[in-house]
Amino acid sequence: MTLPFAWRRGGLALAWGGVLGSLALAPVLAGAPVAVLVLPWVLSAVALGLPHGAVDPLVPFAMRGERLRLGPLAALSVAYLALGALVLAAWWTVPTAAAVGFLLLTWAHWGQGDVYALRALGWDAHLDGTAQRVLAGAVRGALPMVVPLAAHPEVYADVVGAMAAALRPDRAEAARQFVLDVPPWSVWVGLGVLVAAYTVWGAVIAWRRPGARRTLGLDLAEVGTLTAFFALLPPLWSVGVYFCLWHGLRHLARLAPLVADGSARRLALYAVPGTLGALALVGLVFAETLHQPVAGVGAYLVGIAALTGPHVVVVAWMDVRQRVWTGR
């Protein structure tokens, strides 16, 4: 089964360019002020990051080959916003639990996005069935979520605290301490076991299936490089770059053939209303904190969390329709 994926060479070049270019600048970025490190997040508000979910309400029509109709579109948009409002309510009532839930959901979702990319690029010959694809998603999603926690626990805790403080400043320290109570060594061990299991399973498949050796090598090359990327670079920078140039771009490459006939310009135009609406809502709810670098990123991430809930539902539905986890 051929899965749609636009801009294969250009998209890969841009993603890898962002990762390798950042690694080359690691000594400079290590001492960079916070105002510089948050620049990828500023960029994400208008390009690749936030816009990658802005056309979600159009996806069901495109995938079913239906004409866009105002009534169903309005209903989908209202449901989308209602689910986002429920997420914000969770951040108000139980901010620490909401932060943990958001991190776990992002782990699953970013892994989900990379599994689609592996399949669409034809890099999946070593992934033999649903269980191994789920493990691939767990490994890929762990890289941006778990490696920074193990390598930079203080910064990770500061960002989680800033997220909790976005709506409940009195809960910030509790959320921060929750992160600091996790021993970094245990995170490294858990990640090591996960990656080792994935590598061994892939090697067994590659041993039996010669065509899988190349794809396993490509997959593990990305896993190794991304591990170094998140371990060596400041998390504010690395996760922001990944959000834009890796995850966001790959999802847009998935959407372009479905929604915009492969046209980047048309897809960008379709994303404008949703992006502006999302920015307006984030600005309205978090106007007092967005101007502060770390606090602003925390507030922005809570806004993204509200959108991530319904976005994951849409992407999961796409996965089922396209048989990402079950098809050959």
Where are these regions (language model features)?
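Hydrophobic alpha-helical transmembrane segments
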Residues: 175-197
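Membrane-interfacial helical/loop segments at transmembrane boundaries in membrane proteins
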Residues: 157-182
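Membrane helical hairpin/interfacial module
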Residues: 32-95
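A cytosolic-side transmembrane-helix exit/cap motif
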Residues: 58-66, 116-133, 257-268, 316-325
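Predominantly late transmembrane helices and immediately cytosolic-facing juxtamembrane segments
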Residues: 113-119, 242-259
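N-terminal signal-anchor module of multipass membrane proteins
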Residues: 1-51, 301-307, 312, 316-321, ...
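Hydrophobic core segments of alpha-helical transmembrane domains in multi-pass membrane proteins
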Residues: 38-49, 96-108, 238-250, 300-304
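Membrane-interface helix-loop-helix junctions at boundaries between adjacent transmembrane segments
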Residues: 65, 69-71, 85-157, 161
